[in-house]
From Swiss-Prot:
SUPFAM superfamilies: a domain/subunit of cytochrome bc1 complex (Ubiquinol-cytochrome c reductase) (SSF81648), Transmembrane di-heme cytochromes (SSF81342). Signal peptide: none annotated. It comes from Eonycteris spelaea. Heme b b562 binds at H83, H182. This is Cytochrome b. The chain crosses the membrane at residues 33-53, 77-98, 113-133, 178-198, 226-246, 288-308, 320-340, 347-367. It holds the Pfam family Cytochrom_B_C. Keywords: Electron transport, Heme, Iron, Membrane, Metal-binding, Mitochondrion, Mitochondrion inner membrane, Respiratory chain, Transmembrane, Transmembrane helix, Transport, Ubiquinone.
Amino acid sequence: MTNIRKTHPLFKIINDSLIDLPTPSSISSWWNFGSLLAVCLGIQILTGLFLAMHYTSDTATAFQSVTHICRDVNYGWLLRYMHANGASMFVICLFLHVGRGLYYGSYIYTETWNVGILLLFAVMATAFMGYVLPWGQMSFWGATVITNLLSAIPYIGTNLVEWIWGGFSVDKATLTRFFAFHFLLPFIIAALVMVHLLFLHETGSNNPTGIPSDADMIPFHPYHTIKDMLGALTMFLVLLMLVLFSPDLLGDPDNYIPANPLNTPPHIKPEWYFLFAYAILRSIPNKLGGVLALVLSILILALMPLLHTSKQRSMMFRPLSQCLFWLLVADLLTLTWIGGQPVEHPFIIIGQLASILYFSLVLVLMPLISIVENRLLKW
């Protein structure tokens, strides 16, 4: 008798995606982050759903409803901090996943890569809107500053900002629509994940060598399912440590002060994972220029397949490219640090230099060094 998982129309799809999927035998733990992101998305949707049952998206009661969740709802504090710190874990996994793609040349699968960029933007938009919902000081002023950036768009900018706000400032209408979109977007993300996987399974996974591995495949289950479960367990442990021992480590103390439009905090800054882009935005004195640099800092990923000049796909055997890759990582960490600092000397000049280095590395130095490596190998 034929196994039901291979004949049933629905089970067959699951089987071909998660059980009998031929997978390169050489893929390392850097390939774990895709499944970890799926786990993160699951955690976020579940905790978010239960939080939405108790949250009210009204400026008069939003802050109070979050307090009520933490104090009066059974395990509400756990839900709230799992959701807040789960977002941080989500973005850490996302950055590592993108970094893996850059290092091993996974961007050569352009469809999968482009859907991934769409996912990155969707997650960033969701995280930003989620940050506004507790309606603390940083929520309110963060929303004001970031949405105001759209006013830099010529001609339609001001109208666009007021249309997003639903009035002449960030107010009740803004909070309500941000809650609606924050609730909706994770489901759109889940649909995009399916598209991402659909494109990935058309080509099969890349591997650390960057060499086609059709001759050396193993089934996804049990080999990689066990590996993914270990990764998920490790991540869950880190998340629980964060939630139970220092839940506010990655948050902003200003967000425990209710939103007050009449009192501006001394340093307005977004969540820690947006600080690198915020630093690039601040390093350009012109408003429109800053906004363009901010968008390009992420959109530059879409150019990666075009900027690939090496004859080898992966950086595994390219030591010069590896040096530049890790310089890029160090540069992003520097930008993250600068984004959290006040706008004063010497932070301004460090931010400007780090921003120039970021774009130079990706657009100029890395493609050039790849050509040099080709020459050294007489290719």
